[in-house]
Amino acid sequence: MPKKLILKNFLSPGDIVMLTAAVRDLHKCHPNQFVTDVRTPCPQLWENNPYLTPLDEKTPEVTALKCEYPLIHRSNSLPVHFLHGFVEFLNEQLKLQIRLSAFKGDIHLSEKEKAWFSQVREIAGEDIPFWIVVAGGKRDFTIKWWDLWRFQEVVNYFRGRILFVQVGAREHHHPALQGVLDLRGKTDLRQLVRLIYHAQGVLCPVTFPMHLAAAVEVKGGGPKNRPCVVIAGGREPSQWEAYPHHQYIHTNGALWCCDDGGCWKSRTVKLGDGDSKDKPDNLCVDVVGTLPRCMDMITAQDVCRRIKLYFDGGVLPFLTRAQAELTRSFVSRARFIDHERK
C-alpha cells in the first residue's frame, strides 16, 4: 500500500519551485511507493502536476510533513545546489534514496496554456521575441537589489535589438524603467509562468524568476535551455544558486566578506520594521552608497556582455527592423527620479 504524504512548506515561491523538483524525484526514484499532496502558498505552481493526488490531512493514514532544507547551512562549503535541499531532507526523514533527475524545478503547462497568446502578443498584435527584466525585489531583502540606473543602461544599450518586459509584484520594490513593456503588478504566478514560457530570456537578481527560467519548458524553436543573466553579487554561494546554462554574475572570493562562500546578509541598512533582518549580524558590512559592494562591483557593461553572449554565440536572434519599429508604439516612456543620485 503506497504511503500517503502531504508535504508542507510556506516560504517564498522560489523555495516552492525547489520543492517541485523533490516531489518529481520522490516519485521517479521510488515509483508506486507514495501518494503525495502539498500545502504551499503557491497552488498555481502545482497546476497540471502529474505527481499530486488530493489528500485530506484529517484522514488517519495520511502523514503531514513540514519540509525544510537545513542543507543551506552547509552550502558555503559543500558542492550542493538549492535543488538538493528538500531532496536531502526527504531522504533523511523518510529513509529514502532520492536523486535529482534534472537540474531544474518541475513546472507543468497544459497544451491549452501553451497555445494561448502571450501577454506581449496581445499588446503587440504579433509574436515578438522578448526578455523579462526584474529590476527590484522584495522589500525585506534589500541586499539583493542592483542599481536601477544600471538596469536602465542595459535597456538603453539593447534598445531596438531586445524588447524588455518589466515584471514584479505590486507589493514589492520594482521602480519603473524607461523603454520597456511595463507589466509590473499585472501578472499573477500562473501568468508569470506562461510569460516565461514565451520569453526569449530573463534578466534578474537571485530571485523567483531565475528559478522559473530554468524550470519552465522552453518554447519550441529556441535553445534547449532558456537564457538567463543573474546579477548575484556575493550574498549566496554560487554553487547553491547558479544553473549551468545561466550567466550567473557573482563576486564570491573577490571580497573578504564573501571569500568563503556567501555572506547570507539581508540588508544594507536598517528599515526599522521590527524584523530580525535589522539586527547588526544581518546587515551588509561593506556598503557603497546604497548598494552592497559585491553588487556595486558589477557594472552595466558586465551585464550587457553576458546578455550579448547568447546572441554572439548564435542561439538567439535580435529583433528584426520591423519588430523593433513595432515595439516603439507600446514601450513605456515612464520617467523616474532617483533623489539619492546626484
Segments predicted by a language model, with ranges:
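Catalytic machinery of carbohydrate-active enzymes
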Residues: 1-342
